[in-house]
Structure formats: structure tokens, C-alpha cells
């Protein structure tokens, strides 16, 4: 059986909500893929003046994405730097904490419970792109190729950069760790250089966590929000295959129009976007992935 269904699953699971400073809508669609391996989190007002949103794109199975979806917020809230409002450090430490938990016997057991197939070993991992809004400051932590794009002055202000093995800095680390990059893949296998999970690539006891073939350590980008910032578009890589960032923002803005933004309108914008991106068939290979997007509207 190949990676694709004979007909796409167009049904969407959409969730929306509102906080003090944001309105959000999150929508996911399995699409042409045989299984759904995306996951996401959405927590407006997790504590006073802080909202957190995240997308996790699984590979090699759904289990790591589901594990991170379950544990990320709890671990972030427990983090000492989070409590001290040192959010950049808190995000970095929480990404690394996910791998620490996955390496425990309890974590391995929980992963097994999430798995679609009954095997003892897991070779799964996931990307992670997490946006944290504190008052007028936006932080985006990223490991992998999921993305966050800020709509600023009706143009795209990119809040993350993909981590690909053929990037010079990433490739150098991989080679220092004893690996190689072939056809844009680590050791000819994984087309990401940073991810949560993928523990078989993180097993060299002589190397620190940020020196392994694959690392969970995120880049964190920070920006001060302005009145010209309208919304954040977050998505797994399937959302970004067919349209560029400016085209994606234009599509959302067209749906929003000049109407007051509500949960229902934002949900429609998210769902319409996924419909627009879904390929009519699998011949080209793009528009065929699982798709998850979160739209976070910034109240004025």
C-alpha cells in the first residue's frame, strides 16, 4: 500500500476560542494521506497575559506528535524560566524536556499506547513550531519545517526558518556527529535536521543533546507586535507546499474581508484555506500531505 488513499479525507476537525488579546481557529484535515500524524495545541490565556499555540507534524508514526500535544503545556507551566517570564529560555528548555520524557521508561510505554502498529520500537518523531504571546511580544520556537507567518502591514513577516539537512550549519553538525547528508536527508533517511523524538539519531552518549545528528533544540525568534499586525498563520509543512506566504495571507484576508473577526469567521478562513490547498489528485505530490493550520487573530 502506498502513502496515499484512493480518495482524500476532506473532513476537518476545527476548534476555535477567544482570549483577552486573541481569537483563534485551528483546523486539521487528513487529506490524501493514509493516516493523520499532525497534532496541535491552543491555549489562550494559559496564565495572565500569556497565550500559547503550537503545531506538531509527525513522521514515522503519530505517537511523538500526540505525546508532545499532551505534555508540552504542562511542562512549560512547570518550567522555572516560564514562571520568571524568561520565555525564550522556557521554550528552549521545554523542547528539550520533551526528548527527556520520551527517553524514560514511562515515556516509552506511553508512546507504545499511541502507536497505530503493535511493535516494541518507535522510530517516530515530530516537528514543533510553538508561538507564545506575552502582552505585545511574540516568540516563536521552531524545530523542523512547520512554520509561523505574521501578517504585518498585509505582507508576510516570517517567524521561523526550516531546518533542513543541506543547510550549511545543520550539515556541519550532522557531519561532526558522524553522519552524512544524501539527497537532502540525514544518513539518506530523514529530511529534517531538527525534530522532537527520532531517538535513534540521538543515541551517541559522547555528544550533548545539541550536538547529535538530529536535535530538538529550537531557534526562537522574537518580535514586538504593532498595530499593523493582524494575525499569525501557523501550519505544518503541508500548508506551505503550493502557495507562497504572501498568497496564503491574501487568501485568509479575502475570507476575513472587512467584517468584524469572530470565531466563526476565523474558522471559515482556516477551513477554506485547507480546501484551497488540497490537491485534486496525487500526481504532483504537492497538496497531498496532512494539513493543520492555526489562525491567531490579534485583537486591537
UniProtKB/Swiss-Prot annotation:
The keyword Manganese applies. Its main location: membrane. Mn(2+) 2 binds at residues 57, 237, 289. It catalyses: O-phospho-L-seryl-[protein] + H2O = L-seryl-[protein] + phosphate; O-phospho-L-threonyl-[protein] + H2O = L-threonyl-[protein] + phosphate. Binds 2 magnesium or manganese ions per subunit. Keywords: Hydrolase, Magnesium, Manganese, Membrane, Metal-binding, Protein phosphatase. It is an enzyme of class 3 (hydrolase). Mn(2+) 1 binds at residues 57-58. It is a peripheral membrane protein. Its cofactor is Mg(2+); Mn(2+). GO terms for biological process: signal transduction. GO terms for molecular function: metal ion binding; protein serine/threonine phosphatase activity. It holds the Pfam family PP2C. Residues 23-298 form the PPM-type phosphatase domain. The keyword Repressor does not apply. Its EC number is 3.1.3.16. InterPro entries: PP2C (IPR015655), PP2C_BS (IPR000222), PPM-type-like_dom_sf (IPR036457), PPM-type_phosphatase-like_dom (IPR001932). GO terms for cellular component: membrane. PROSITE patterns: PPM_1, PPM_2. SUPFAM superfamilies: PP2C-like. Enzyme with a broad specificity. This is Probable protein phosphatase 2C 3.
Amino acid at each position: 500500500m502506498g502513502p496515499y488513499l484512493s480518495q482524500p479525507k476532506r473532513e476537518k476537525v476545527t476548534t476555535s476560542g477567544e482570549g483577552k488579546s486573541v481569537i483563534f481557529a485551528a483546523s486539521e484535515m487528513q487529506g490524501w494521506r493514509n493516516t493523520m500524524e499532525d497534532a496541535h495545541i491552543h491555549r489562550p490565556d494559559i496564565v495572565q497575559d500569556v497565550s500559547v499555540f503550537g503545531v506538531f507534524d509527525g513522521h514515522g508514526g503519530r505517537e511523538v506528535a500526540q505525546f508532545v500535544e499532551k505534555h508540552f503545556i504542562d511542562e512549560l507551566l512547570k518550567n522555572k524560566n516560564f514562571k520568571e517570564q524568561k520565555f525564550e529560555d522556557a521554550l528552549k528548555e521545554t523542547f528539550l524536556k520533551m526528548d527527556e520524557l520520551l527517553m524514560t521508561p514511562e515515556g516509552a510505554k506511553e508512546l507504545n499506547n499511541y502507536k497505530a502498529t503493535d511493535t516494541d520500537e518507535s522510530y517516530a518523531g515530530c516537528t514543533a513550531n510553538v508561538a507564545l504571546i506575552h502582552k505585545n511580544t511574540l516568540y516563536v520556537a521552531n524545530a523542523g519545517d512547520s512554520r509561523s507567518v505574521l501578517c504585518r502591514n498585509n505582507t508576510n513577516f516570517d517567524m521561523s526558518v526550516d531546518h533542513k539537512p543541506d543547510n550549511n550549519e545543520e550539515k556541519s553538525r550532522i557531519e561532526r556527529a558522524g553522519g552524512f547528508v544524501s539527497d537532502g536527508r540525514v544518513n539518506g533517511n530523514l529530511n529534517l535536521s531538527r525534530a522532537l523524538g527520532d531517538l535513534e539519531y540521538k543515541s551517541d552518549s559522547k555528544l550533548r543533546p545539541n550536538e547529535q545528528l538530529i536535535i530538538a533544540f529550537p531557534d526562537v525568534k522574537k518580535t514586538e507586535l504593532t498595530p499593523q499586525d493582524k494575525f499569525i498563520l501557523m501550519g505544518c509543512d503541508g500548508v506551505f507546499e503550493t502557495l507562497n506566504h504572501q498568497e496564503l495571507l491574501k487568501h485568509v484576508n479575502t475570507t476575513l474581508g472587512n467584517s468584524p473577526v469572530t470565531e466563526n469567521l476565523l474558522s471559515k478562513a482556516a477551513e477554506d484555506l485547507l480546501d484551497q490547498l488540497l490537491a485534486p489528485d496525487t500526481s504532483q505530490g504537492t497538496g497531498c500531505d496532512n494539513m493543520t493550520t492555526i489562525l491567531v487573530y490579534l485583537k486591537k
